[in-house]
Amino acid sequence: MVRGGIRDTWRLKKWFKVVAPPLFGETVLGTTPADDPDKLIGRVMETTLFDITGDYSYVHVKMYFQVVRVEGDTAYTRFKGHELLRDYIRGLTRRKSSKVTGIFNVWTKDGYGLRVTAMAFTRQRCKTSQKSAIRKVMQEIVEQKARESTLDELIQLMVFSDHEGSLAYLIDESARKIYPLRKVEIAKSKLLWVPGPNGPEKAVVVSPLQLKVT
């Protein structure tokens, strides 16, 4: 076995610190190795809102951030989306009750497009017409608040669901007039579009290495 000719690529790798966006105080999300900083561009980091805030009540909120640039030994990210743990959602589901789901594409006032999934859990099983009415309330609130908010403001309205004025809070406040609710959550979000020089662009992060002509 020839060992002399084997290149130890691991030793050539450098460790980079990955940080959250300014909205989350550029909290360190972790470290990752790479032999070329450009290879980090587009990489997705997964964490929980608990890891970012230190608040255990958010341990069920998964957060996704994507590396958009590297400066020195620090990789900077932007929000890519969030999702509640499946076990948490499963725990909210009850027999003889209804789950109402609404999926909406919305735009923020600073030009970002997102897909937002809202869920409401009723105390008892409700009628189809009541589900439709609740879903309509969801849509009106999610779309309106998105139009009135920047991306950073909307992120906070989505993920901090227990805060007064959050999307979940506002939906619960209005929809419970239609039928008694047990819980409302913004179960998922995904960044789809970002502002560009010539209008909205797909939220796709391309590494410079992919742009090089081989």
Curated annotation (Swiss-Prot):
One of its GO terms (molecular function) is structural constituent of ribosome. One of its GO terms (biological process) is translation. Keywords: Ribonucleoprotein, Ribosomal protein. GO terms for cellular component: ribonucleoprotein complex; ribosome. It comes from the Archaea. Belongs to the eukaryotic ribosomal protein eS1 family. NCBIfam families: PRK04057.1. This is Small ribosomal subunit protein eS1. It comes from Aeropyrum pernix (strain ATCC 700893 / DSM 11879 / JCM 9820 / NBRC 100138 / K1). The lineage of its organism: Archaea, Thermoproteota, Thermoprotei, Desulfurococcales, Desulfurococcaceae. The gene is rps3ae.
